[in-house]
Amino acid sequence: MPPKAKISKEMILDTVLDITRQAGFDAVNARSIADKLQCSTRPIFTCYKNMDELKCEFLDFAFEFYNQYVADYRASVNTDSCLILPLSYIAFARDETNLFKLLFINDMDLDMTEEKDFYKEVGNEEKAKIFSDSIGVELERGKAIFLDLFLYTHGIAVLTATGKLTFDRNNVEKMLKNLLSAFIK
């Protein structure tokens, strides 16, 4: 029976997460992972065929990290339920800049030429339904408002992640409420 691997996929993914959080995903390569794990590159390529396979699995892992961030944010902040996603998105851009850039700028899997394309992305339809219910509008109207809110929020988050904007949570919350009140009459 061969010896049990000392370096697991979980250890590799945690290490890639650490490197990405500190230096950005561009700093991730087999050597940087191996150096941080204090091993050769061989265990990495025992677990993964190549770096592309690792990147693909890491994107899912990083998105789960983001989902946990949103859940933790929801539990720690007292605000309107319809503002949790936009506020947590902007906070993630501020707190986890390198992960935000990876997930929502560089590798964002969104190709929009029409409004309906936004709802082809996994999860957006369900989020829009929950949002519509929380603001008390019909689904089609809620989807239009949710998309507008996303585009507005994404702009603020990108400006935050690139260091161009440094509003505190109260200011951002006020801006989002103003936007929503303009749409919900």
Q: Each PLM stretch: what is its role?
A:
Residues 70, 110-137, 141-147, 174-184:
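Amphipathic alpha-helical packing segments from all-alpha helical-bundle domains
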Residues 102, 150-168, 182-185:
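Amphipathic C-terminal alpha-helical segment
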Residues 20, 54-62, 70, 103, ...:
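Alpha-helical DNA-contacting segments of helix-turn-helix folds
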Residues 57, 71-98, 149:
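Hydrophobic alpha-helical connector segments
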Residues 1-23, 27, 32, 53:
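Basic, helix-initiating cap at the start of DNA-binding domains
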Residues 91-132, 158, 162:
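Short secondary-structure transition hinges
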Residues 22-25, 38, 45-55:
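HTH DNA-binding helix-turn interface
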